[in-house]
Amino acid sequence: MSDADRQRYEGLLEEMARRDAPVVIRRKTDSRLQGFIDSALRVLTLGGQDRYLTDYVTTLGTTIWVPATWEDWSYRARYKILRHELVHVQQFERFTWPGMVLIYGFFPLPAGLAWGRAMLEWEAYAVTLEVEAELDGLAAAADPGLHDEIVRRFTGPDYGWMWPFEGWVRMRIAETLTAISRRPPMP
């Protein structure tokens, strides 16, 4: 664990707290709603999404819900995930709660062709790639293992098989990497 990672993470937490609508972090295990969502996802994905409470971070409005083990994760990992999740906070602000429920959950379908969810998640995964490049270099963002993981999430049960088009996901990854590689280096 590096001191720079801790400072970066703590700085982001301070930014989150200073917002007009502060962003808060809560444990999923402290919420009945999160337990209900976990149970519903297990049923809807035929057991495919069985790690919602233990491995996944979820944003609803200005609350970022984390697993009970969140504090055990490295500062670097938490920072990367929060950057991804803050995209979802901005989406809630842009589209409102009813809009997010409709776009994320039902447009045009809840599974298989969940274009709305795929677009919202892609916006956040593009930031995931940007943060990888910022912190660990372009080679880390270009890692085929990371790309395979992103593809698996889009096409598998993690998000309810939201977008079955692997080629589309890989094309978006490639476009994002090209855009990142053309940016001037950060100081």
Feature locations, PLM:
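Well-ordered, non-membrane alpha-helical segments in soluble/globular domains
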Residues: Q7, K80-L82
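A metal-dependent hydrolase signature that marks the N-terminal structural subdomain at the beginning
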Residues: M1-G48, T178-A179, P187
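Compositionally biased, charge-rich terminal segments
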Residues: L12-G35, R83-W97, L135, P144-P157
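An active-site-proximal "capping" alpha-helix that borders the catalytic cofactor pocket
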Residues: M119-E132
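Pan-zinc metallopeptidase signature
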Residues: A140-P187
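Active-site scaffold of zinc-dependent metalloenzymes
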Residues: R42-Y79, F92
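Post-HEXXH active-site segment of zinc metalloproteases
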Residues: L60, W73-K80, Q91-W122, P144
